[in-house]
């Protein structure tokens, strides 16, 4: 035995190195239990979410999501076609509007030309009427002068004959 004058009591070596409170084995046991509990919780959650993912509601949701995606794609395609059709229709409308404007301008020019031609025709008709009147006057004057000449021509002939007869009488 050791001398009695040491100030501490003799302690066995294996007790000396162990920490006070819980031992390392207990810590490992607690850690293992926690890992197993966490694993069980994770497995339960995976099973729960796997069942939820394969449930009818989830399948219906996925099917509806696919239908919505397809419908959205179809609607986008139809919208694109409608926009293209609208653009083409607007271009045709602009072309038609331009054609209408050109035709309106052309019509205004034609109306103006027609009015000018009608005014010219009216002027020429008036001139023709005036010339016809003058022609009628000249015909009337010619008839009068012809009648006068015929009348005066007959008296000239008669007077010429009388003079001739008188000269012949006087001469013989």
UniProtKB/Swiss-Prot annotation:
Propeptide span(s): 153-172
Cross-link (Glycyl lysine isopeptide (Lys-Gly) (interchain with G-Cter in ubiquitin)): 20
Glycosylation sites: 70, 97
Membrane topology, as annotated: Single-pass type II membrane protein; Lipid-anchor; GPI-anchor
Lipidation positions, renumbered (GPI-anchor amidated serine): 152
Stretches of the chain found on the membrane's Extracellular side: 48-152
Cellular component, GO, one term: Golgi apparatus
InterPro entries: BST2
Keywords: Cell membrane, Coiled coil, Cytoplasm, Disulfide bond, Endosome, Glycoprotein, Golgi apparatus, GPI-anchor, Immunity, Innate immunity, Isopeptide bond, Lipoprotein, Membrane, Signal-anchor, Transmembrane, Transmembrane helix, Ubl conjugation
Domain writeup: The extracellular coiled coil domain forms an extended 170 A long semi-flexible rod-like structure important for virion retention at the cell surface and prevention of virus spreading.
Protein name: Bone marrow stromal antigen 2
Organism in which the protein naturally occurs: Rattus norvegicus (Rat)
The organism's taxonomic lineage, starting at the top: Eukaryota, Metazoa, Chordata, Craniata, Vertebrata
């Amino acid at each position: 035995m050791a001398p009695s004058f040491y100030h501490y009591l003799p302690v066995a070596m294996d007790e000396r190195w162990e920490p006070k409170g819980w031992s390392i084995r207990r810590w490992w046991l607690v850690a293992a239990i926690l890992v197993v509990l966490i694993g069980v919780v994770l497995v339960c959650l995976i099973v729960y979410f796997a069942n939820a993912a394969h449930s009818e509601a989830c399948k219906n949701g996925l099917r509806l999501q696919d239908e919505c995606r397809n419908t959205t794609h179809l609607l986008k395609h139809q919208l694109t076609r409608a926009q293209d059709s609208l653009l083409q229709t607007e271009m045709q409308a602009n072309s038609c509007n331009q054609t209408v404007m050109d035709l309106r301008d052309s019509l205004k020019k034609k109306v103006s030309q027609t009015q000018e031609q009608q005014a010219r025709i009216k002027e020429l008709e008036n001139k023709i009427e005036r010339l016809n009147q003058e022609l009628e006057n000249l015909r009337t004057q010619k008839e009068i002068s012809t009648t006068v000449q015929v009348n005066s021509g007959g008296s000239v002939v008669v007077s010429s004959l009388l003079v001739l007869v008188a000269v012949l009488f006087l001469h013989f």
